Every structure is written in C-alpha cells, then in structure tokens.
Amino acid sequence: LTGRTPNRAGVYDWIPSGTKTHMKKNELTIPAMLKTAGYATCMSGKWHCNGFFNRKEQPQPGDFGFDHWFATQNNAAPSHENPRNFVRNGKEVGKLKGFSCRIVAQEAGKWIESHVKKNPDQPFFTFVAFHEPHEPISSPKSMIKNYPRAKKKGEALYYANVENMDYA
C-alpha cells in the first residue's frame, strides 16, 4: 500500500489482534495519492495493518484513502468458509455464505460495476487482498477431489484453496 517495506512503515512483525501495533496514519499510500488525482478507491479483503480493527484508536482503511472498504483485520473467521467477521465501511456485516476469496472478489466486482455505472468517466483503483491460502484452510469439496495424487490431505486442501482463488 505504501511502496515501502513493512519495517520502513513502522510494522516490524505480524500484527496480532488487540495490539498497539499499526501502520502509522501519516503513511502516504497509493490510494491516497490516487484520490488526489481524482480516482475513486476501493479495498476488499484482508486488512492486516492494525491490531485494533474497526476501532477509533487506530487508523482504518478509510484513513488511508479508501472510499469504500470491505475487510477483516486478519483472517476470515472462523475459517475461509462462511466467514462472520467482515466489516463494510465501519459496519459489521455478520455471517456470510460462501468462501472468503469469492466473497472478496464479488464485493470488489460489485463496487467496480456500481462505480462505472454512476461515474463512467472517473478512473478507479481497486485493491484486493485474498485471505487464502492462509490457514485455517477451507476449500470446496468438489475442488479437493481434483487432487487425488496429493500425498497428504493438507496438500489437496491447499491446492484446492489456490484453485478456488483462480475461480474467484
């Protein structure tokens, strides 16, 4: 988002939920720069830039230049399937049906379609960050069956997880 390594942006390790660690609000981000050039901006997916997600104590996606955002702090929970921890523009969404990668892609696609319809001449930027293939892995059973030569069940789950992103 900044074009810099995490260390240069003040993030030195992974960011567990409920910690003071976060990307500093004064970081210049690509969406913030594009907004100054007249772009509309959207973020959909994993927002792993703070420990206090969707709380005023730390900056949120909208503070970094996103007009529309649909995200989780870290992973889709309780798993990639039927997640319940998404937030849209500061409002909790509740339990969703389906796999996270497809939900994230659909949200971005709907935003793009709506934006182009309402503002056909305005350029836009969409940032999509899938949760997959991060653990805990959950994949469609129909895709797991595509990998009968996998040596372990975990391998088939992983391959199906990547395939599911391809179809998102």
Protein language model features and the residues they cover:
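Formylglycine-dependent sulfatase
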Residues: 1-168
